[in-house]
Amino acid sequence: MAFDRNAEEDLAYGHKPVLLDGCLTGLNIRPDGIYVDGTLGRAGHSLEIARRLSGGGRLICLDRDETAIAAARERLADYRDRVTLVHSNFSRLGEVLGELGIPGADGMLFDLGVSSPQLDDAARGFSYMHDAPLDMRMDRTAGLTARDVVNDWPYEELRRILLEYGEERYAPVIAKHIVRAREHTPIETTGQLVEIIRGAMPAQALREKQHPAKRSFQAIRIAVNDELGELQPMLRAAADHLNPGGRLAVISFHSLEDRIVKKTMQELATGCTCPPNFPVCVCGKKPKMKLVSRKQITAGGDELSYNPRARSAKLRVAEKL
């Protein structure tokens, strides 16, 4: 399918869905099927799924951000007969489907990470480009904020998340500067944090193309929202709640997420793990899924021209056996 988007509609809702054609092809949508969008956002993917469903089909949409739910309700109004919106994190996938009386789905989509509207809304505190209160919560009813992390977490924990979640090579010195700065005054805003990070980095690093705070902000955001901790359990729950032949499509935006998605899908697609010298299988392990494509799907030139934020997006698809 050639890349084709309604630019005016995407602009109106402040979000351009990434790898949309790949997702729709990967999900192999049936008009009467049951589908789950576990990361609703501004409903760019959900809208196109809903358009392909008949009155007998159903789409369950989850998001932990109540602002996203409100915007999506308006955007999906024409399909309210087949769409159910749920304010919930995808970590509760099994519970939500159980509460709705849905034993299995024919396809599930998860578009990981922070959405464009969350980044662009300065008040949410996700962006290092705008000065705002340190928040970074995808679910604003949750307790932990970025302010809590940078002001309360000990040096070792700060160093660990900057290194593991941000893959920041200057993690030790940045963590030291954060701890030193907060001893004098609490770190309240993204602007304060950016300046602390700048002050911690050597001149050579400040001359690089990438913004000096990018990796640190990613790390803190992941910690606030427990993004990596919830990912593998969600993927396994999704596999358990797919009908045979159902598809799981996952979009990731950085190597940490993609490694987890790739590894978990490969494990779900692997059968017997007995040593090769065993005459018969004793582990009893059978594959739950098969990989639809062994390589990740990435954006083509047309999509990148329309939406540069798709550059780092990777799509992987697996099918329930």
Language-model-detected regions and their locations in the chain:
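S-adenosyl-L-methionine-dependent methyltransferase catalytic core, i.e., the SAM/SAH-binding region
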Residues: 1-321
